[in-house]
Amino acid sequence: THCVVFENPNGASFEQTGGIFQKPEGQAFLQDLFTVAEDGLEGGGTPILNFGEADFNKNPYLMLINVRVSDAKRYSQLFSDFMNSSDLPGSATMFQDTFTGEYKRTHYIAISGPSVDSLRETTSASLSSQDGENFQRRAANIRKITSTYLMFHVKSWNE
């Protein structure tokens, strides 16, 4: 019924928002929030492909892409070929959805980077390349993007 939304004019402003939650007041807010809130992006998946360095200390900013795929084996091959030709600043992991709060999602892709701007620029450059255009053309009949999100880690159960 509710969500927390920040509007940011640029990538640097988005990145500064994360600092709010590192302060004691931000941590207290999150603790209170978790007593009355239910996650909207609830779900879980099994990682099936990984590319690059998945170090969230170096690459704390995430792009999440939810997709519905009709031929998982074919899409995985197309995605692998595309990722092998891309120059990622961080990592990309494709997950097969195990249970979901996202309507009709079968897979999701998490791409990490050192900044929001680097994520956006690298993704744009990769998709605009010849390999990116080939990937998009070949994947068009078997994959539908259902939603995308820009996120940053506030807390991790591993810490």
Stretches found by the model and what they are:
Residues 1-159:
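Short S/T/G/P-rich N-terminal loop/turn motif that feeds into the first structured element of a domain
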